[in-house]
From Swiss-Prot:
Active site: D371
Top-level taxon in the UniProt lineage: Bacteria
Chain segments annotated as coiled-coil in the UniProt record: none
Gene: aceK
Protein name, as recorded: Isocitrate dehydrogenase kinase/phosphatase
Family: Belongs to the AceK family.
Record-linked InterPro entries: AceK_kinase, AceK_regulatory, Isocitrate_DH_AceK
Binding-site residues, ATP: A315, P316, G317, I318, R319, G320, M321, K336
Annotated NCBIfam families: PRK02946.1
Length: 583
């Protein structure tokens, strides 16, 4: 290879990342117009398009590099020099941390995820002490109640870039003040002030105002979801001021926000104060930088591994028929491998399973489906694998594993947030906790269905409970669109003997689902059955599901709320409008 080619390659990769992030910002910047025009289908399409941008631009750069090198192989020393040149380009680069991840992605695409070492990749950042340099403009603006909270909130809402009229701004301000007074107390409120992010955070059918509420006792989140009526008038739906509420809004089971962030590291640092329970990976994920979030997630895993003497074990819960799941006892994530062979009743391929996981990545997860990170050639130290798990890996997924002596390489796996399996949770709780869990499960099914997702396998074992008590779906191998399912009523038995027969007396075609059958496995436990019948009996009726299908086919996009219905101002303080979207 001619000298100087290393610098050209390094510059080509960085220019490719510039192009990718420029398009990322371009798609993001259209969020306001999509919201104002209530173009909800365009919102969904933009979300998918933005996710695809990264891999598309990695592919473009890889093709450029193959042209530059004329398809010739490059030795290790050459690649190390490329990385050295790339590193020298980053000290004054505003998005250096994501540029490092982009370099990693290009390398992995070129070399098929082989030879992934710290020398060749940015497994750890080249600038670990650096956060960000001078910010060209402030990320947020401060508002003080010098003339009272009514004036302060009027200034905040009037400063928003939204071009739609307000339905009743004064009313919304009264509601916000009422909430703050209830939360903080009338005496404390005059001694508080607010800092509000300059950019709105768009997701689904809401524009979120994200801020920090500084009180005499510390800093709290200040979140206002702004919705629009069918007539195009704005209203504030609620006010959230606890870290738990903010954590759910920015949760791992939700779609990524569309927020204009030319300096994502600066925004992540700003958000950290009101989301103290979120890791760096989770914060990058929330603002849509999912590939860099994967890098940060892997770094968090390596740091945990370095400080722990735990062994990998099979994850608690009922063993899956498609996925082999393992974890570290104290780690908050699980590792999922597609088995080489599935149980006989699972008539599908590994490619189908991967397609299901990709569907979830691109779809609106409505707070009910866990996000995943996908890895190839994942290396584990044999000394850190429990013998029982090692035997299970060799039994269930031998084709996915390469033995390198002291290590094994897993060809493909997913990493996902660890939750308590719902079936285990239900065994351990009683009273109100049991009731809440059943209510959450039914709500999860409803919200997934309204978002055009049918889980397929609705057994409790396929759902998990988060630390906030929310029920989230995490087993995707039978997932499909609601519009692909044929929901049927079970025909009446022809003879009394029909109901005792081992085979159904009616024909069943692929795609047929009989909701009446859900009752057999969801209500078998006498503690659970009556609660389910009380709260979710309509889930056992085919006409309920067909009505949802009709709404979806007619183009209706349901509202998705990241908070309880009882927290909405319309419920707490009075009706907003007969035309406002309802939950």
């Amino acid at each position: 290879m001619p000298r100087g080619l290393e610098l050209l390659i390094a510059q080509t990769i960085l220019q490719g990342f510039d192009a990718q992030y420029g398009r990322f910002l371009e798609v993001t910047s259209g969020a306001q117009q999509r919201f104002e025009q209530a173009d909800w289908h365009a919102v969904q399409q933009a979300m998918k398009s933005r996710i695809h941008l990264y891999d598309h631009h990695v592919g473009l750069v890889v093709e450029q590099l193959r042209c530059i090198t004329d398809g010739k192989s490059t030795d290790a020393d050459f690649l190390l020099r490329v990385k050295e040149h790339y590193t020298r380009l980053l000290p004054d680069y505003p998005r250096f941390e994501i540029a490092e991840s982009f370099f990693n992605s290009v390398y992995c695409r070129l070399f098929d995820h082989r030879s992934l070492t710290p020398e060749r990749l940015f497994i750890f950042s080249s600038q670990p002490e650096r956060r960000f340099r001078t910010i060209p403009r402030p990320l947020a603006k401060d508002f003080f109640p010098d003339h009272g909270w009514e004036t302060l909130l009027m200034r905040i809402l009037s400063d928003l870039p939204l071009r739609l009229p307000w339905q009743n701004k004064s009313r919304d301000i009264r509601y916000i003040i009422a909430h703050l007074t209830e939360t903080l107390g009338e005496d404390a409120l005059p001694r508080c002030h607010v800092q509000v992010a300059n950019e709105l955070f768009y997701r689904n059918k809401a524009a979120w105002l994200v801020g920090k509420l500084t009180t005499p006792d510390g800093t709290l989140p200040f979140l206002l979801p702004i919705h629009r009526t069918d007539e195009g008038e704005l209203f504030v739906d609620t006010c959230l001021t606890t870290t738990a509420e903010a954590s759910i809004v920015f949760g791992f089971a939700r779609s990524y926000f569309m927020v204009y962030a030319p300096l994502p590291a600066a925004l992540v640092e700003w958000l950290r104060e009101i989301l103290p329970g979120k890791t760096t990976a989770e914060l990058y994920m929330a603002i849509g930088c999912q590939k860099h979030a994967k890098t940060e997630s892997y770094r968090e895993y390596l740091c945990y591994l370095a400080e722990s003497d735990e062994k990998f074990i099979e994850a608690p819960g009922i063993r899956g028929m498609v996925m082999l799941v393992f974890t570290l006892p104290g780690f908050d994530r699980v590792f999922k491998i597609i088995k080489d062979k599935f149980a006989p009743q699972k008539e599908m391929s590994a490619a189908h399973v991967r397609a299901c996981y990709q569907l979830v990545k691109e779809h609106d997860r409505v707070g009910r489906m866990a996000d995943t990170q996908e890895f190839e050639n994942f290396v584990l130290d044999k000394r850190q694998i429990d013998p029982a798990l090692m035997a299970l890996l060799r039994q269930e997924a031998p084709e996915k594993i390469t033995d390198l002596g002291e290590h094994i390489v897993i060809r493909h796996l997913y990493i996902e947030r660890r939750m308590v399996p719902l079936n285990i949770w239900l065994e351990q709780v009683e009273g109100q906790q049991l009731r809440d869990a059943i209510e959450e499960y039914g709500n999860a099914i409803r919200q997934l269905a309204a978002a055009n997702i049918f889980p397929g396998d609705m057994l409790f074992k396929n759902f998990g409970v988060t630390r906030h008590g929310r029920v989230v779906f995490y087993d995707y191998d039978e997932i499909c669109y609601m519009t692909e399912v044929n929901f049927r009523d079970i025909p009446p038995a022809r003879y009394p003997e029909d109901e005792l027969a081992s085979e159904p007396w009616y024909s069943v075609s692929p795609g047929d689902v009989f909701p009446e059958e859900f009752r057999h496995w969801l209500c078998a436990d006498p503690r659970i059955g009556p609660l389910f019948e009380e709260m979710h009996a309509d889930l056992f009726r085919a006409d309920y599901w067909r009505a949802l299908q009709t709404r979806i086919k007619e183009g209706h996009v349901e509202d998705v709320y990241a908070y309880r219905r009882r927290q909405r101002f319309s419920v707490r303080y009075g009706a907003i409008s007969s035309t406002a979207n309802s939950s």
